[in-house]
Swiss-Prot record:
It comes from the Eukaryota. PANTHER family: AUXIN RESPONSE FACTOR 17, AUXIN RESPONSE FACTOR 4-RELATED. Residues 124-223, 443-542 bind DNA. This is B3 domain-containing protein Os07g0183300/Os07g0183600. It comes from Oryza sativa subsp. japonica. GO terms for molecular function: DNA binding.
């Protein structure tokens, strides 16, 4: 049976073997299934072979549903089209009934000859431009590209005959010569070009087999043919291998459980519609991680066990809950990529993650899906305790990535029966003085003009804005400005004043390019009042990169086991603190919010200052989530505010005069604050209204002490769930958990749930 299966794998026209077929396929596509393996057949992908948007066509033609089938590969025959000279594969599939589905086993190993054939084939590919396809009577390619495929020239100044066969075995004799550092094919090239009717974007593939030393030429068409091809006079017309009738017939036979054959020609990246079962099922496990606004990268799975090839990056714009799963992830690719904006969930992975469908571990499953420890061997099999944890802060470390500051917080979960009271941090002794840097700063958001049109210079907003930060200049004066970034690197930038405009000129473009500044990024200039040194930092407009999904998953499960863990916090959005002092949370329980109430957003700031009052809005709904207290209150803000409409109850307070202030003290009572004018380096890099400043700069706190954060005593912290409305960062998918009442199976009320966290304070 093994010999028969191997024979079926490459049983075709006798010329096209597996190595030649892969050479003619799209560069990062063309994965052929192994005979005898379990695969999923996607009807929509099959229809894509002749139609860019197959779903409406399939519905119009009444293709019977469903449109995805689990099958066994019965045969793979490799052929070449007589009209287009393209290699394609006829894949014969046997549908598998639901009751016949076996346990998931590893796919059969490809035949040993496959790897040997690929090593015995040398080839190069050239994509034809308009001059190659329409005007030139000869084919030219750099000598370095063709030296391993074309034979060496006997006489560099003369031409010699070169016999090349097409994929049907028909020989063509070219005039083979040299022109400078390029080799050329003439004479027969014009006839071959006319017979193939090349268009701009088509590719030709020249191949040489080492065993017989014969040359072959194949063609890869750009996606679909825009016009019918002219037929060679010496050959009868042959219809295209993929037709509408074939797709309809294949879908009907698959639905009836009958064997069928599908034609696959690889023209674009990631167009495989016969996908190994294990790849799809692993991708299904990873699918729950994806949410809009996440940054992902396209990943191609290659042949012969090769590691996956990483493609362009992009951001998820939408996830479509399509019935048959085909191309359900919509992605906005960066860098002008021509990739299809609709991708399959097994073809993408999160940026910075090693997870991919063919080799990715399963993500942590929800309590409803945790049926045995075998499903997630590295995770606890018991139900998770909830989405919020009472913790003690043991350390806060400050660092920078690409000149943007972030904080790494070390937390130790506290069991409910060991709840601790907030304690004041120990006063530093005389041997460990606390260093506080006084800074003056200003911030400028980069417009399109700053980031694109005039990126060779930086316009200072106003002279008064930079006063105290940048040096004073006279008209037409320019001085070198020595300024350090957040990594300590010193930059020398020319600072000048011309025609009432202060600007940074020479040297600025180096900083902008090194940090890849884009429209919407904020540049923060700071000057130390003590040392006089100047600093330059950034606040990015894109999603945080230091925070990976793996980090959040690990934090959730370590917190569930009451083990120490670390979280990364990067401040880019107002009110996005997910580690909140317990005193702030239980003080907020005094508030009584109702729909229609007018409230202010209030930012809690560092250094015991008065809270900053933000925009005014109206409460329109109060959610009572079963397992979370994160962003429970929905507020209608003015359109100009740009605020997230879902807020936490400790972030708002009732507007004075509308109702009693004492009943809605959501952050901290005002008498708990005293103004402090100093601002440190971390404060300057935070958002304009002072949300989330860290008081201690690069200081670790011992486990026996507490830490002052947001101007409050911070011993335990509560990291709740991030918002999923599109304004959150990468931690919006996996969040922390809240206790359930497991005795009676009922979901406790919000106050009951908080009482379990703060039993002595409520």
């Amino acid at each position: 049976m093994a010999a028969a299966a191997a024979a079926l794998a490459d049983d075709g026209d006798g010329i096209v073997d597996r190595a030649m077929w892969l050479a003619c396929a799209a560069p990062n596509s063309g994965r052929l299934p192994a005979v005898g393996s379990m695969v999923f057949y996607f009807v929509d992908g099959h229809a894509e072979q002749f139609c860019q948007f197959p779903a409406p066509l399939l519905e119009q033609l009444a293709v019977p549903g469903p449109r995805v089938f689990l099958c066994t590969v019965a045969a793979v025959r490799l052929r070449a089209d007589a009209l287009t000279n393209e290699a394609y594969a006829d894949i014969t599939l046997d549908p598998v009934a639901d009751h016949d589905v076996p346990r998931l086993l590893p796919a059969p190993a490809p035949a040993a000859a496959a790897g040997g054939q690929q090593q015995q084939l040398r080839y190069f590919v050239k994509t034809l431009m308009s001059s190659d396809a329409e005007y030139r009577d000869r084919f030219a390619v750099p000598m370095d590209v063709a030296k391993d495929v074309f034979p060496p020239l006997v006489d560099a100044k003369a031409v010699q005959p070169l016999i090349v066969k097409d994929l049907q075995g028909s020989p063509m004799t070219f005039d083979y010569g040299r022109n400078g550092n390029r080799v050329t094919l003439a004479k027969v090239w014009k006839k071959f070009r006319d017979d193939m009717d090349f268009v701009d974007g088509d590719s030709v593939i020249f191949m040489r087999r080492r065993d017989d030393d014969e040359l072959y030429v194949g063609v890869r068409r750009q996606r679909t043919l825009d016009k019918p091809l002219r037929t060679r006079r010496s050959r009868p017309p042959t219809p295209l291998p993929v037709a509408v009738q074939e797709v309809i017939a294949a879908a009907g036979r698959a639905a009836a459980g009958e064997q069928f054959t599908a034609t696959y020609r690889s023209r674009q990246d990631g167009d495989e519609f016969v996908v190994p079962r294990e790849v799809v099922e692993e991708g299904l496990r990873l699918r729950s991680r994806f949410t809009p606004e996440m940054e992902v990268e396209f990943v191609w799975a290659l042949e012969d066990g090769a590691p996956p090839s990483v493609g362009p990056h992009g951001k998820i714009t939408a996830i479509h809950d399509t019935t048959w799963m085909w191309r359900s992830v919509e992605i906005g690719w960066t860098g002008g990529s021509e990739m299809n904006k609709y991708a399959n969930f097994w073809q993408v992975r999160l940026v910075g993650s090693d997870d991919f469908a063919s080799a990715a571990p399963p993500p942590p499953l929800s309590p409803k899906r945790l049926k045995s420890s075998e499903q997630c061997p590295s995770r606890p099999p018991e139900p998770l305790p909830g989405r919020v944890f009472l913790c003690k802060v043991t350390a806060v470390r400050l660092d920078a990535t690409r000149n943007e500051l972030f904080a790494t917080m070390s937390l130790i979960p506290v069991a409910r029966d060991q709840a601790i009271q907030p304690q004041a941090p120990a006063d530093p002794g005389p041997s460990s003085p606390q260093v506080q840097t006084t800074l003056v700063s200003f911030v400028k958001p980069l417009t399109c003009t700053d980031a694109v049109k005039n990126r060779y210079r930086f316009i200072v907003p106003k002279r008064e804005t930079a006063m105290g930060v940048l040096p004073q200049l006279q008209l037409n004066e320019h001085v070198p400005l020595y300024i350090k970034d957040m990594h300590g690197k010193e930059w020398v930038i020319n600072y000048t004043w011309k025609e009432y405009t202060h600007m940074l000129s020479s040297g600025w473009i180096k900083f902008a390019n090194a940090n890849r500044l884009v429209t919407g990024d904020n540049v923060v200039f700071m000057r130390s009042m003590d040392s006089g040194e100047r600093y330059m930092g950034l606040r990015r407009t894109l999603k945080p990169e230091p925070v990976s999904v793996d980090e959040v998953i690990e934090a959730v499960w370590r917190a569930a086991r009451l083990e120490p863990f670390e979280v990364t916090y990067l401040s880019r959005q107002d009110g996005d603190e997910f580690v909140v002092p317990c005193g702030i949370v239980h003080n907020a329980l005094r508030a009584k919010f109702t729909p229609g109430m007018v409230v202010n957003f209030v930012w809690a700031v560092e250094e015991d200052r008065l809270p900053n009052v933000g925009p005014q809005g109206k409460v329109i709904a109060i959610e009572n989530y079963a397992t979370s207290i994160w962003r429970m209150i929905q507020v209608e803000w003015p359109s100009c505010a740009g605020m997230n409409r879902y807020v936490n109850f400790w972030q708002i307070r009732e507007v004075l005069g509308e109702s009693s202030f004492e009943a809605s003290t959501c952050i901290v009572r005002s008498q708990d604050y005293s103004p402090a004018p100093q601002r440190n380096l971390v404060n300057a890099l935070q958002l304009p209204d002072g949300t989330k400043q860290l008081q201690q700069n690069k200081k670790s706190v011992s486990s026996s002490s507490t830490f002052r954060l947001f101007g409050k005593k911070m011993t335990p912290g509560v990291p709740p769930r991030r918002d999923t409305s599109g304004l959150s960062g990468q931690v919006s998918l996996f969040s922390h958990y809240l206790p359930h009442d497991e005795d009676d199976g009922q979901v406790p009320t919000m106050r009951q749930r908080l009482e379990t966290l703060f039993p002595d304070n409520i």
